[in-house]
Amino acid sequence: MTVKTEAAKGTLTYSRMRGMVAILIAFMKQRRMGLNDFIQKIANNSYACKHPEVQSILKISQPQEPELMNANPSPPPSPSQQINLGPSSNPHAKPSDFHFLKVIGKGSFGKVLLARHKAEEVFYAVKVLQKKAILKKKEEKHIMSERNVLLKNVKHPFLVGLHFSFQTADKLYFVLDYINGGELFYHLQRERCFLEPRARFYAAEIASALGYLHSLNIVYRDLKPENILLDSQGHIVLTDFGLCKENIEHNSTTSTFCGTPEYLAPEVLHKQPYDRTVDWWCLGAVLYEMLYGLPPFYSRNTAEMYDNILNKPLQLKPNITNSARHLLEGLLQKDRTKRLGAKDDFMEIKSHVFFSLINWDDLINKKITPPFNPNVSGPNDLRHFDPEFTEEPVPNSIGKSPDSVLVTASVKEAAEAFLGFSYAPPTDSFL
């Protein structure tokens, strides 16, 4: 197979191919790093710290949202501040209600497991988080916010739904929809990029999900291929709402420095107040990656990548349509006030000529056949999950419901920090 690049129009040499592979491997590894770990790493690099943009970023002023920046957390919310969880007579779920079958994902605070409910014989994805790790990084308010956002997702087909949440003395459990078509990141790794019709379909479903969150005054803030799943039919499902910010109305802003390096909008890097349009920048970055194989301003040198995001003009190769080009230019506009979506939010995206072939009513009702079918044979088909996860043994402690727990100061602290976490749906819910 002949591969051509902008720099060399002929067949790639072995040395050039090795260089490309090295770039992609470095890119994948870096993508798996948390933002906090990345900032710590760059802060310890004396050469990187000399770069003016890095110096600017590291001099972060006092954030308005302390839970994401390792400041002292606010006192835990009182029961009256919690979302109404329905009739208190509903029984709480417990770990022993499930058969935990496979590890299918990992994160900063725990694991995601495929589990089958013993009584219902239904498969779920159960996100199990360690309270000790959450409290150590002072992220308890952040976790409660994720749970609150999940409770609002039940009415949209392209957002993962929460069925139960409960806790033991040392762990939190999110019982979620089980989605086994694989991460968009996984499919991009295998295929490198997508044809425009396929990219348009995914972008439309993603935009629909973001528009719904915005209608609830929620900004997603962490759109990236790792957080976009495909269901068994090939429709997208957004997951991981840990960086969502609630109560952001149309003209409201927030200022926390958070997100994933490759997808940070210029206003976030500048430490300026930002609004819902940060999600439309991320949509542009993901669409660009689907069409070209890498994020728009990517560099192995993170300081250089940040400088590209802030200062480098958007460069688009000629192998896309004019409508795709126009959409990318609108979404990846560095001035958020001029960005597509700044005035009428999702309606501007929806009415763009790039999506003129999309029937939005059919889209939301899943009447449009996805351009790619993951071809999973059933819930036990794990072909689209990373073997790094699925080959890992399931920890014995995850499925146990201890009859008694030694009450220590740390256990009491955890109980207070996650007050109101447990959730059982009311009888008229989506279950």
Swiss-Prot record:
Its main location: cytoplasm. Changing residue 127 to M: Abolishes enzymatic activity. InterPro entries: AGC-kinase_C (IPR000961), Kinase-like_dom_sf (IPR011009), Pkinase_C (IPR017892), Prot_kinase_dom (IPR000719), Protein_kinase_ATP_BS (IPR017441), Ser/Thr_kinase_AS (IPR008271). Regulated by phosphorylation. Activated by phosphorylation on Ser-422 by mTORC2, transforming it into a substrate for PDPK1 which phosphorylates it on Thr-256. Phosphorylation on Ser-397 and Ser-401 are also essential for its activity. Phosphorylation on Ser-78 by MAPK7 is required for growth factor-induced cell cycle progression. Residues 356-431 form the AGC-kinase C-terminal domain. SMART domains: S_TK_X (SM00133), S_TKc (SM00220). ATP binds at residues 104-112, 127. Its EC number is 2.7.11.1. The modification Phosphothreonine is found at residues 256, 369. The active site is at 222 (proton acceptor). It comes from the Eukaryota. Keywords: Apoptosis, ATP-binding, Cell membrane, Cytoplasm, Disulfide bond, Endoplasmic reticulum, Kinase, Membrane, Mitochondrion, Nucleotide-binding, Nucleus, Phosphoprotein, Serine/threonine-protein kinase, Stress response, Transferase, Ubl conjugation. Induction: Induced by a very large spectrum of stimuli distinct from glucocorticoids and serum. These include aldosterone, cell shrinkage, cell swelling, TGF-beta, ischemic injury of the brain, neuronal excitotoxicity memory consolidation, chronic viral hepatitis, DNA-damaging agents, vitamin D3 psychophysiological stress, iron, glucose, EDN1, CSF2, fibroblast growth factor, platelet-derived growth factor, phorbolesters, follicle-stimulating hormone, sorbitol, heat shock, oxidative stress, UV irradiation, and p53/TP53. Residues 98-355 form the Protein kinase domain. Two specific sites, one in the kinase domain (Thr-256) and the other in the C-terminal regulatory region (Ser-422), need to be phosphorylated for its full activation. Phosphorylation at Ser-397 and Ser-401 are also essential for its activity. Activated by WNK1, WNK2, WNK3 and WNK4; which promote phosphorylation by mTORC2. Residues 81-91 have a biased composition (Polar residues). Belongs to the protein kinase superfamily. AGC Ser/Thr protein kinase family. Serine/threonine-protein kinase which is involved in the regulation of a wide variety of ion channels, membrane transporters, cellular enzymes, transcription factors, neuronal excitability, cell growth, proliferation, survival, migration and apoptosis. Plays an important role in cellular stress response. This is Serine/threonine-protein kinase Sgk1. The gene is SGK1.
